Amino acid sequence: MTKVEETIRNFRHFSSLLTLGTLDTFNFRHSIHFELLLLLALLPSLIGCKPTRPAADSQRSRTTPTPGSDAQPQFWVRVLLLNDATACTLDFASPFDVTCVTPDSNSQPQEEFFENLDAPPRPTWDSQRRGRGPVPVTVSAGKISIAGQPFDANEVTVCPKEPHVFTLNGSDYRGTLKLILDPNGGSFDAVNHIPLESYLAGVVGAEMPDYWEPQALKAQTIAARTYCLYIKKRFGADRAWDLSKTQAHQVYRGIDAESTQIWNAVNQTAGMVLVCKQAHPGPKGTPPEALGADAADDIFPAYYSSTCGGHTENSKNVFGDSFEPLAGVPCPYCQDVARPEFFFWPMTKLDAADVTEKLWQRYPRLKQLGQIMDITPAQQSDYGGFHRLTKIELSGTTGDSDFLRAEDLRLTLDPTGTKLKSTICQIAKSGDEWVFSFGRGYGHGVGMCQCGAQAMARQGKIADQILAYYYPNSHITRLY
């Protein structure tokens, strides 16, 4: 515990005792004055801040060799860092190699290898310019250029040597970086190839504060590992990357999210995933109970969100997939941990014309409705005292109507999810505005409730118990 945290704890402790009348005011007057003065002095630096790891810990993470570089190919992950980029900057802790895939005269891929391209060793990892400074990456005339050298290639892979770390636009990542030229030749995607366990160290610290309970961090790690491998298995074969770095999948911040606590959670759960009977959905619409008692164990998408608001949701109602561990459970825990403005979020008003425009852009078919005049619940989950919208009906000035999943509506109108925090809310038209009121919870609400996991860990529950609660009828197995 830092001195700042200790000061705040003592201040709260003294205040509560005085309120209860259990302390003699005179005897503790000077102590309280001291604590108050110190707290006031520190207040400007505390407002809006969260605890951060010491700089030394960050420095050590950047210079420590990347674990898992010898992992089997199925346990490497491809993370989309940039999409349709036209330029970026790279920097390195070490020399790097470049491998290119180019079409030959027969249009067959051919590798070309360039060693130590203009990259002397960088002895330090300070915040100043390292060695010769950042390396520019651009695209022009259908070619990707690195440090001014163009490559007639569809794919350019940059492989830093130990500690296998690179910096992309100021953020540090482990592994290698593949630059993939768009078919039109005017942009590129940047994809981070990284061992699974190193990837998780960049996810868990971004998805959950590293000062939370170790058992909550371990539960988060197992859920994130399971989710990653499921998405990779289901979608990775059809594209050049497995997951994006955003909340569309899992938030990934690379080395900036690492800390000793996070690596402890990753290392102590290495290879552990959640499985359930016949996790893959089977023929479309097949309910889990129809798959048979002899179905094999398999991974499933172990979704999770910040604050469920009191009950987790059935994945079928949000994402359209049906898995027995994702049917939804009551959650009496998260209100004890969640910030008040997350558990009960404030009324939000959106301009009606903007709502229509955003819906038209995202779903062109909705233009046939004209201006959106009515948004009504078509399906909702009732949890006694509150309900979560799962499907909504849109009606327009043309007299036509259409339907959307409520979660799709939420993220279309507020892609960051910071204003419309969940679909536990009421929607009404007021003049030229849409009003979202009585909001509750933060996120899609499927799978593990992160605040609930922290509350359970505070009560002494271990990671296995937390996961068994939020993903019933699943169990943990170790892949390696």
Protein language model regions, located:
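Intrinsic disorder/low-complexity segments
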Residues: T2-L38, P44, Q108, R122-S127, ...
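Conserved, single-site charged/polar hotspot
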Residues: L38-L42, L46-Y480
